[in-house]
């Protein structure tokens, strides 16, 4: 089975251990072997809450430079849509992964970070659960790789 790895780094100051990785779409750096892992995702686009057809695995860790996410989508290469789009393009025709973060865990402010398999990025901010703006541009880096 082919897979695609969508990996990105959020440049948000968060103190923890001192790591050093290369942002290259490859999860072979030693830090990834000790990273926290999330699995068991459900489909939310469309909002069916069904188990997805293909497995997704998320790894994450922090260091003194930021928060790192490594996302592996186990998806046949023949079904992968690899297109590059303008930054913040919501209607991009490409496979993508979203990470949404609510640092206060109270729905007062949330941050969305999206990367497509073609390395296009999108970021936005949500305020009070439903006020949305994509005029907010964070400093962050992403690189994807398809196998």
Where do the PLM segments sit?
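Positively charged n-region of N-terminal signal peptides that target proteins for export
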Residues: 1-5
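Bacterial N-terminal signal peptides
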Residues: 7-17
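Structural preference for beta-rich elements and adjacent junctions enriched in aromatics
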Residues: 19-147
